[in-house]
A protein has these predicted regions:
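Extended alpha-helical targeting/anchoring segments
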Residues: 1-421
Length: 421
């Protein structure tokens, strides 16, 4: 049996992520075979159970509500293109290229089938080959695999310049723009995922096998968590690379903390998320708990804030998700206009990228990560996306370089993987 056939969903937590606790020990949640699955293109939903498929016309988030009410745990994603059904007045008007993935896609499990434990127990149980440590990874500038971006450097820089022009005109304050890359993948997707996680452990790593493709994510960003009547979001805006020495690393981190540009960018998204939460929360309950804190990962430092609010405990999951989707940190501000600008400037479909990935429980609690650092795998093929927030004083060349920085964990893991081929 291939390792990817043992579990259909695995959520890895380096600390205070999926498991929402303060444990420093990396942990996991995993599920074997789903009892039911459903996916949608727009509001045409396909439900599969016991080998039988049914197509119905309905809001997929209402289908999610229904199955949670029946006692299932749901693991999956809400894709970026579903924004057309959550953002009033927005409709895509440009043809896009690239693979079309379902807009909403969930696997449904009996809660009793969930297993959890420490990360080392998982890798031992899967009988994985020894995973190389980061220090043994290829660190040369030349990748050991052929990477195919969907835009040339010139095209990417021009896209950023056009985004800046909208900012200078006063249409928007910030916009997130991305590029897509495709690489060859010659090993089992789950083995690649664990190598990806080993390169850069994060709180919201996820592996979900939908059958015809696999979704892998190395996200470190909490989009939205509901725990009882409390909602929490941790928007990330502001990135810098790690230093080669401890001294340089400290200097780079200090520069990020004191950067007016990064603080302004972060604050804009904090204000956007406050507004989004306010539309579904109890009056006066929205508050900012943390502002401009820096989290450190193996390849970069990132600036993080936290917004919290209170909701009615009986509120439907679908109502909460509709009020805040898509994540503001990967769209921009104001949200509706930035969706229109992204639609105009980006040539590709985003799919699960910049959507929300996560787990929903029968009691209405859920945890959703922002769909960043994702890799979509099909036989022999890995597709991933990298992007960044553009503001009025962004340097297009530096923005391009930031996308390469953000892709390091994914490409380093591919270096290992394709060496094994």
């Amino acid at each position: 049996m291939k390792v990817s056939e043992k579990y259909s969903s695995i959520l890895l937590d380096s600390g205070n992520g999926w498991l929402s606790n303060d444990k420093a020990t990396p942990s996991y949640l995993a599920f074997t075979k789903p009892e039911i699955s459903f996916s949608s293109i727009g509001q045409e939903v396909t439900i599969k159970s016991q080998g039988i498929s049914n197509l119905i016309s309905v809001d997929p988030l209402e289908v999610l509500d229904d199955y949670l009410g029946q006692g299932y745990v749901a693991v999956g994603y809400i894709g970026y293109e579903y924004s057309e059904h959550t953002m009033e007045g927005f409709s895509s008007s440009h043809e896009k290229e690239g693979d079309k993935f379902p807009d909403v896609n969930f696997l449904l499990y009996d809660p009793e089938s969930m297993v959890s434990g420490e990360y080392e127990d998982l890798t031992s149980h899967l009988q994985m080959p020894e995973i190389k440590k980061e220090s043994s990874l290829n660190t040369s500038n030349e990748p050991q695999f052929h990477l195919c971006p969907n835009m040339s450097i010139c095209q990417y820089l021009n896209m950023v310049k056009k985004g800046k022009a909208y900012i200078e005109q006063g249409d928007i304050y910030q916009v997130n723009l991305s590029q897509r890359m495709i690489a060859q993948l010659r090993i089992d997707p789950l083995e690649y995922f664990l190598k990806f996680y080993n390169v850069q452990p994060v709180p919201f790593a996820s592996y979900i096998n939908f059958g015809d493709f696999q979704l892998l994510s190395g996200s470190m960003e909490l989009f939205l968590r509901k725990n009882g009547n409390k909602l929490t979001t941790n928007p990330i805006k502001g990135t810098t690379k790690r230093g080669r020495t401890a001294e340089i690393d400290t200097i780079l981190k200090a520069k990020l903390i004191s950067s007016e540009k990064e603080r302004a960018e972060n604050l804009m998204i904090v204000d956007l998320m406050r507004n989004d939460l306010g539309r579904v929360s109890l009056p006066g309950s929205v508050k900012v708990n943390k502002l401009f804190e820096v989290e450190t990962y193996s390849t970069l430092h990132q600036m993080v804030s936290e917004v919290e609010s209170q909701v009615d405990e009986n509120i439907q999951v679908s109502q909460v998700v509709r009020s805040v989707f898509p994540p503001g940190s990967v769209t921009g501000a104001p949200k509706k206009r930035t969706l229109e600008v992204i639609d105009e400037l980006e040539p590709h479909l985003r799919g699960p990228y910049c959507g929300a990935i996560g787990i929903f429980y029968p009691n209405g609690d859920f945890t959703l990560s922002v769909g960043i650092r994702i890799v979509l795998t099909k036989p022999g093929k890995a597709t991933f996306f990298v992007g960044g927030g553009i503001v009025w004083d962004s340097d297009p060349q530096k923005e391009f370089e930031e996308t390469l920085l953000k892709s390091q964990a994914m490409t380093k893991a591919m270096d290992i993987s394709n060496d094994a081929g």
